[in-house]
Regions:
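Cysteine endopeptidase catalytic domains of the caspase/legumain-like
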Residues: 2, 7, 16-228
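Active-site glycine/GP-rich loop and adjacent strand/helix microenvironment
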Residues: 10
């Protein structure tokens, strides 16, 4: 039942006026210290635009504004406003490492935003419905952080109402789409989210996944995971 409610919040937020949606959308194309990307800021901008048609609580961080401190502080402050019946959404498109997500000012693995930190922020939020869309290399690490010191913090138990949409497994890299405005993962994610009320979580993932496989020869299968 909670899964159905959560999908309605994703696809039909205008039908649930009593529920407030809080969104933090992050995209980084030009990094301070590591190699640049092309479409990631477009990804975050388009995801923010999609949710702005349904809520005023959308924060967009791109480029040099998406520092480590800024991302963590924004997630904490924005999601702290949510009540139990609300929905929080975190979208990230950029570089990822096996230890976490790379902010604008990330220099190496020790300065990334660890999966444990992200999970701690999400788990501390009062909202019962939490969505994470991660378009980055090694995104699967968010499910099970490889760092033993924070693995307990980064795992999501089944009571937390968290749904993860991840572009890669723990040991996989992601690739940008050589054509168009958006990366491959985000392109089909956006298309799926705009697809109408009849789509389910499984159908949404199958639609995006089958399209990706049809358009490319990438030796990987992006992952969807629900702890609902």
């Amino acid at each position: 039942m909670r899964q159905l409610l959560l999908l309605l919040c994703i696809l039909l937020p205008h039908l649930l006026p009593a529920r407030t949606i809080y969104v933090v959308s992050v995209g980084i194309a030009k990094y301070q210290y590591i190699n640049n990307l092309r479409q990631t800021e477009n990804d975050a901008t388009d995801m923010a635009a999609l949710y702005r048609t349904h809520t005023t609580h959308v924060t967009l961080l791109t480029g040099k504004n998406a520092t480590r401190q800024s991302i963590c502080t924004t997630l904490k402050n924005v999601f702290a406003q949510a009540e139990a019946d609300d929905v929080v959404v975190f979208f990230f498109s950029g570089h990822g490492s096996k230890g976490g997500l790379c902010a604008y000012d990330t220099r190496g693995a020790s300065t990334c935003i660890s999966y444990g930190e992200i999970a701690k922020i999400i788990k501390g939020c009062r909202a019962n419905n939490k969505l994470l869309f991660i378009d980055a290399c090694y995104a699967g690490g968010l499910r099970h952080d490889s760092n033993a010191a924070v693995s307990a913090q980064s795992s999501f138990d089944k009571t937390e109402g968290v749904m993860l949409f991840l572009s890669s497994r723990t040991n996989e890299t992601s690739r940008e789409n050589p054509y168009g405005r958006n990366g491959q993962f985000t392109r089909y994610l956006l298309r799926g989210l705009k697809g109408g009320a009849t789509i389910t979580a499984t159908a949404l993932w199958r639609r995006r996944n089958s399209s990706t496989l049809w358009l490319s020869t990438w030796p990987r299968l992006p992952r969807a995971s629900s702890t609902l």
